[in-house]
Amino acid sequence: MEKVDTTSALQPLIKELLVQNKMGIHARPAAMIVRITNRYKCDVFVEKEEEQVNGKSIMGLMMLAAGKDSKVKFIATGDDAAPMLGELETLFARKFDEA
């Protein structure tokens, strides 16, 4: 798996988010996340425990097996990282529009 380049001139922004919806990050929430991340040019990776995946990959996100009450960390590098992380924070707070 690809790791975050820590030698970049831009410092990564990191946001840890709590998965609050009942079913966790399954196909639909993963697609919602990717819909947001793909609108931005920044690089984004998602970590759960020791595993890191590309935040622009539905399959990668599903492989994290992030269930309810899991914490996932978004690591974004680029000029538009902050607004993207803000959108993701809102999406997680809305519980992916699920009950």
Question: Predicted segments — roles?
Answer:
Residues L10-E16, K71-K73:
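Intrinsic-disorder/low-complexity, polar/charged segments enriched in Ser/Thr/Lys/Arg/Asp/Glu/Gln
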Residues I14, A27, A93-R94:
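Short, intrinsically disordered low-complexity segments
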Residues I14-L18, F45, L85, E89:
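A general secondary-structure boundary signal
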Residues L18-M59, M63-G67, A76:
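Compact, glycine-rich, soluble single-domain proteins
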Residues G67-A99:
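C-terminal structural segments of small proteins and small subunits
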